[in-house]
Design a protein with these regions (language model features):
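Conserved Nudix-box catalytic region and its N-terminal flanking loop in Nudix hydrolases
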Residues: 15-56, 153-167
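Conserved N-terminal beta-strand and adjoining loop/helix that marks the start
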Residues: 1-17, 39-40
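Unchanged
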Residues: 39-67, 77-135, 139, 162-167
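Hydrophobic alpha-helical interaction segments
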Residues: 148-149
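A structure-centric signal for secondary-structure junctions around beta-strands
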Residues: 2-4, 12, 28-29, 92-94, ...
Length: 167
């Protein structure tokens, strides 16, 4: 199992996203997604560590530092039956989601992950994204915290195995 974090920074009707660069073995290659990435082993051990991981990943990818992010949810990306063009049977990925409404810093023009952009909330559903990410954005629109599972069979979202429970 892998562990990661994602940050949902929403300011004045716009959401901070990354247009990912195209690369092999990246399920988000060429897609739009939230800033985030793998947690370091010491960050996984506590809520504070996971929060610091979200702040770190967002700053690395976008140049922006989240102010007072709050925990929003946790998603298990159930990947054992998932396939990509050149990547068979990836590991499950447990992702902690944090939300912020304020930030400091200057937006980078690009990073190793892609191009950070402010996207109008009304446009997000029209962007090229992973099926699982589209489901995650639906859950984030609700103001409640959540626990979710996103499951794929092959390269298709398995709706019957995908679920959310609001807390």
């Amino acid at each position: 199992m892998k562990y990661g974090t994602m940050s949902y920074l929403s300011v004045d009707g716009k959401v901070l996203m990354i247009q990912k660069i195209k690369r092999e073995n990246d399920p988000n290659s060429g897609y739009y997604t939230l800033p985030g990435g793998k947690l370091k082993p010491y960050e996984r051990k506590s809520t504070q560590g996971r929060l610091e991981g979200a702040i770190r990943e967002t700053k690395e990818e976008t140049g922006l530092r989240l102010i007072n992010p709050v925990f929003r949810g946790i998603i298990l990306f159930h990947n054992r039956e998932r396939t990509f063009d050149n990547w068979k049977n990836p590991q499950d990925y447990l992702v902690y989601i944090f939300e912020a409404k304020k930030y400091t810093g200057i937006l980078k023009s690009s990073s190793d992950e892609g191009i950070p952009l402010w996207i109008d909330e009304t446009e997000i559903s029209n962007l090229p994204q992973n099926h699982g990410d589209k489901k995650m954005y639906e859950w984030l629109k609700d103001s409640r915290n959540f626990k979710g599972i996103i499951k794929h069979r092959g390269n298709i979202l398995d709706e019957s195995g995908t679920s959310v429970r609001y807390l």
